A protein has these predicted regions:
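Short, surface-exposed basic-aromatic patches at helix termini and helix-loop junctions that form
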Residues: 111-114, 136-144, 206, 227, ...
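Extended hydrophobic secondary-structure segments that form protein cores and membrane-embedded regions
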Residues: 22-25, 120-122, 232-238, 261-263
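C-terminal accessory extensions appended to soluble enzyme cores
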Residues: 1-10, 92, 230, 244-245, ...
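Alpha-helical substrate-recognition element adjacent to the catalytic core
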Residues: 3-6, 11-191
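Conserved Lys-Pro-Asp/Glu-containing loop-to-beta segment of HAD-superfamily phosphomonoesterases
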Residues: 21, 197, 201-240
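Short beta-alpha junction loops
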Residues: 125-127, 239-240, 264-269
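Acidic, divalent-metal-coordinating active-site segment for phosphoryl/phosphodiester hydrolysis
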Residues: 238-250
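Short helix-terminating capping/connector loops at secondary-structure junctions
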Residues: 16-18, 112-117, 147, 215-230, ...
């Protein structure tokens, strides 16, 4: 398998028409380096907070073998280890998102939002989906790291006949079309999210295909366009296990319209 450094393009083509590029983003350590911690247990039953990047490295060991971590011997998970990532942490999520450092896929997120492209957030977190939406809305309206509510609205106005209304209405309708998948919400597992992320991506692919078909018909009717409209999705994640499982799933299905990007170090296409 060839691996190359790439950037995801998006938005409108040279004719000013939608280019049918869509995005699916993991959240933690991909879009942002959130301060939220998983709680693990050390020898002596002391609770130790573990960041998401470290958890991606150590999660295969937790509860299976003891290991040293920041001067402690970790023997397993603490009680309710993902408490900060679930509904109990809903309010804190938005606050953390406002102050968190941006991650390796942030520039793509800027292009996606400012260009009015449809996206999905597919994360191992277990917050209410509405909480993820509120977080995105808050950082866009705050102008975090180059995001622009005004640019997003101007891009959405190019979709006349597809979405209409004033700026706030356009933006809310836009978010209605996007998807927010906290895969450990409800019965999902934050410790082993790979299969749930695949299910979420599969749902987003179906959603994108449906949107693209509707958009293609509209553009053909309004502009007498006879091109082949093929949607392309870029999925990015910093967790190698998630990336490998998604890549295998797509290869097994023969899905050629989804590009998978591993973002742990340099952003690479798998």
């Amino acid at each position: 398998m060839e691996i190359m450094s790439v950037e995801v393009s998006e938005g409108f083509n040279e004719e000013g028409l939608p280019d049918f590029k869509y995005y699916a983003f993991d959240w933690d350590d991909n879009l942002m380096y959130m301060p939220t911690e998983i709680m693990v247990k050390s020898f002596g039953d002391q609770e130790i907070g573990m960041g998401t990047a470290d958890f991606a490295e150590y999660r295969g060991k937790i509860g299976k073998e003891d290991f040293d971590y920041k001067g402690h011997t970790i023997v397993g998970f603490a009680e309710n280890p993902f408490r900060n990532f679930g509904v109990d942490g809903n309010d804190q999520f938005v606050k953390d998102a406002m102050i968190a450092k941006t991650g390796p896929s942030w520039n793509d997120f800027i292009e996606c939002i400012n260009g009015g492209s449809i996206f999905a957030i597919i994360t191992a977190r277990g917050h209410n989906p509405e909480t993820l939406r509120e977080g995105v809305e808050a950082i866009v309206k705050d102008g975090k790291g180059g995001l622009s509510f005004e640019s997003c609205v101007e891009s959405l106005k190019k979709y006349k006949g597809i979405i209409d209304g004033d700026g706030e209405e356009l933006f809310q309708e836009y978010l209605d079309l996007c998807r927010f998948h906290p895969v450990s919400f409800g019965a999902g597992s934050a410790a082993n999210p790979e299969e749930e992320k695949i299910k979420a991506l599969e749902q987003f692919i179906k959603h994108v295909n449906s949107l693209s078909e509707e958009l293609a018909v509209t553009m053909e009717l309004e502009n007498d366009i006879k091109n082949n409209f093929v949607p392309m999705i870029g999925f990015s994640d910093d967790d190698k296990a998630n990336v490998d499982n998604v890549k295998k799933y797509l290869d097994d299905k023969g899905e050629e319209n989804v590009n998978v990007y591993y973002t742990k170090t340099d952003k690479t296409k798998m």
